């Protein structure tokens, strides 16, 4: 949001899929009938499925990720005339969604700060967080692939200033190359 350009937020899209997509529900219910009981899909049911068997995260991902990917393609198509779009996708690299000309920005945050934010969530579950972390690439790999790094350990105002500077840098580099 701070970039003030169209933003595709994968986490928000996943939530929308759970809330709106009956086909996703039917597939999950068929594959995980012991856990998925009602539509819209409840996060508590997903958490229970992953808690009981770590392999269930792969089943869930195999159903949800293609739907989110289609939504991302639609978003990119709708915003193709925009100077810039922001893809806020935590598993961008893991799902091989980055393209050659993309400019990757690694957002670094202190572990304690991340944990503090996660604990504020309604369905906070440390076991699930550990399972999700195992599905992610190592932070060092992500940092190496990124052209820029921003520290997210500051106030919103400081972040706005940092993002403004980063935007200017990106536009300058794009216009001079």
Where are these regions (language model features)?
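A conserved segment at the C-terminal end of the G1
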Residues: 1-12
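Conserved beta-strand scaffold positions in the cores of enzyme catalytic domains, especially
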Residues: 5-7, 104, 149
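An amphipathic alpha-helix signature
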Residues: 2-3, 25-29, 111-119, 126, ...
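ATP-dependent NMP and nucleoside kinases share a basic, alpha-helical "lid"
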Residues: 71-79, 84-121
């Amino acid at each position: 949001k701070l970039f003030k350009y169209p933003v595709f937020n994968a986490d928000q899209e996943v939530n929308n899929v759970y809330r709106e997509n009956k086909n996703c529900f039917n597939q999950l219910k068929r594959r995980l009938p012991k856990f998925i009981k009602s539509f819209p899909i409840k996060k508590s049911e997903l958490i229970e499925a992953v808690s009981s068997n770590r392999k269930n995260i792969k089943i869930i991902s195999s159903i949800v990720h293609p739907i989110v990917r289609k939504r991302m393609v639609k978003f990119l198509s709708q915003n193709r005339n925009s100077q810039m779009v922001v893809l806020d996708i935590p598993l961008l690299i893991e799902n091989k969604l980055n393209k050659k000309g993309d400019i990757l920005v690694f957002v670094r945050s202190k572990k304690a700060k991340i944990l503090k934010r996660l604990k504020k969530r309604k369905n906070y579950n440390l076991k699930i967080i550990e399972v999700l972390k195992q599905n992610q690439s190592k932070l060092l790999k992500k940092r190496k692939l990124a052209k820029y790094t921003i520290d997210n350990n500051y106030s919103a105002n400081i972040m706005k200033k940092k993002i403004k500077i980063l935007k200017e840098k990106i536009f300058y580099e794009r216009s001079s190359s």
